[in-house]
Amino acid sequence: MADLLWQKPGVAVDAKIQTFLAGDDVILDREFFLHDIAASAAHAQGLQHIGILSADELAGLLRELDVLAQDFRAGRFVLDTQYEDGHSAIEARLTERLGDAGRKIHTGRSRNDQILVATRLWLKEKLQRVAQLSAEVAKVALDRAQAEKDLPIPGYTHIQRAVVSSAGMWWAGWAEAFIDNAIRARDTHALVDANPLGTAAGYGVNLPLDREHTTAALGFARMQISPIYAQLSRGKFELAALEALGAATLDLRRIAWDLSLFTSAEFGFVALPAQYTTGSSIMPNKRNPDVIELMRATHASVAAARTEIEQLLSLPSGYHRDLQSSKGAIFHGFGRGLAALELLPSLLANLEWRDDKLRAAIDSGMYATDVAVEAAVAGVPFREAYKAAAAGADSAGQGRTPEGSLAARVSPGSAADLRLDELRARWQALS
């Protein structure tokens, strides 16, 4: 490993201790590395503004940072265990190429605010993708709700047949859910869109740093003013981002549950595209819905990441090395969550309803609620109407059709009044 930035003269660092301290840091920092480079460029510009760097030194630093980013993307520069972390790698590379100009890059900053700003940029990018994917899911659901608004399907409570419903209602429910998920991700993006660069180790520095410049250069909406709060927000903002992701994966889990049931032989309501199924290593007859089962499991990874960070945050104010462990949690949570959400729009667009199976699952008792409500409209107290309908539930469907039941469901949001135009307007407002 290269010399450590913090190593004191004459003090040897035990290799086992150093390996423990580093953990997976340098590997995890590959995710942040391009953001760390971008923040280093903005910081260098700020240092030139206050006279720490000359114009020539700044030009050299910006040139070498750009080359480093290109080399990293192309695989010519590998961030590996010869470096303590990504921050050390950047400084080592600049020092190797530029000498004293590279040694000046860390003036006025700490690795504490360096990782904060790189993480913040990474979280903004991931939250934008959560919002985009949620909007894509909502669009598919809205389009299918419109196309299949009159297709009868059985509605369930307690996984028991309840009332006649429609594919339009089912799709509209998911559309509204993912519109809300997109809004949640967008709102969380606004929360984390605050620049911590320039807060150093959490107490500021005795330099008039141009934080307004770095805020604008890195595309942040605002400066995070208090150095104390900058450190307090580490973990807190990651937690908020995971909660926004978790809102989407929670709905993903429930839609995957529906599809797990609907695709089973016992239900048979839905046919999945072949590319979303797998086979068995021993049973030649099997088509397993592995994709939706792994989608269903995704929320557990997101929830686990959130729990890990919550436990790490049992700390007093200021920076603590415990927070290093938050990086692996957010990488794993967002990695699993986004991978599953990426597949969802296409899956939903290509599933097929089996009309014959859907109609066969609508039995006479599923009209009993209609009978009770109709009697109440005619003047019978609802509780009496309910009891009468319950007694005659087995014959409630006589002379009735699923289409007739759906046409009578006129309460706002129900089958005969889906309010798809209102939902589409909400979806359009996302852009």
UniProtKB/Swiss-Prot annotation:
Record Pfam families: Lyase_1 (PF00206)
Enzyme Commission number: 4.3.2.1
Pathway, per record: Amino-acid biosynthesis; L-arginine biosynthesis; L-arginine from L-ornithine and carbamoyl phosphate: step 3/3
Annotated localization: Cytoplasm
Catalytic activity: 2-(N(omega)-L-arginino)succinate = fumarate + L-arginine
Keyword Endoplasmic reticulum attached: no
Cellular component per GO, a single term: cytosol
UniProt-listed PROSITE patterns: FUMARATE_LYASES
Keywords: Amino-acid biosynthesis, Arginine biosynthesis, Cytoplasm, Lyase
GO-annotated biological processes: arginine biosynthetic process via ornithine; L-arginine biosynthetic process
One function term, GO molecular function aspect: argininosuccinate lyase activity
Entries under NCBIfam families matching the protein: argH (TIGR00838)
Similarity comment: family membership: Belongs to the lyase 1 family. Argininosuccinate lyase subfamily.
HAMAP family registered for this protein in UniProt: Arg_succ_lyase
Name of protein: Argininosuccinate lyase
